[in-house]
A protein has these predicted regions:
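Anaerobic metallocofactor- and corrinoid-dependent redox/one-carbon enzyme cores
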Residues: 1-155
């Protein structure tokens, strides 16, 4: 699972800020009647929706090698497929596939991701920034307010 073993704290929709820390699922499917084209998941639209929820930096996990970037915030690409990383190493930031090949363990790759997040937050450019990826898309979607049952109890 891309989310690891963390407990899911709640569900939010684009533009909602999580009320507490923890792992949230982002509901990107528009509310209302089913319309042609939805769900039409687009990596760049989902990155913009995460930023609308308050994300300043995006850790983007990929196995196929999506070459997304962002016009607004840095995108760090963590690739879990060693072959994809080798083929797209100029555009991928972290080779998490080393774990599958026995060249690194989970803690080592975790430290690499943490160190890269800190470096990018302090001004180092991610690979997509170095390559000039400045994609942006904001799909038209309509969302109803989320109910309290989807959020953690905050005292």
């Amino acid at each position: 699972a891309k989310s690891g073993a963390s407990q899911i704290v709640g569900l939010i929709k684009p533009g909602d800020k999580p009320p507490t820390g923890g792992l949230y699922l982002l509901d990107v499917i528009p509310d209302g009647e089913v319309r042609h084209g939805f769900p039409n998941i687009n990596d760049n639209a989902e990155i913009a929706e995460l930023m609308a929820c308050g994300a300043h930096l995006n850790l983007f996990s990929t196995g196929r090698g999506s070459v997304v970037g962002s016009a607004i915030s840095p995108v760090i690409k963590v690739c879990g497929n060693p072959e994809t990383f080798r083929n797209l190493s100029d555009d991928m930031d972290v080779d998490a596939g080393r774990i599958l090949e026995g060249r690194a363990d989970l803690d080592e790759v975790g430290r690499e991701v943490r160190d890269l997040v800190l470096a990018v937050a302090n001004g180092q450019k991610s690979k997509s920034e170095m390559l000039g990826h400045r994609e942006f898309i904001l799909g038209y979607k309509s969302f109803e307010p989320i109910g309290p049952a989807c959020l953690p109890n905050v005292a």
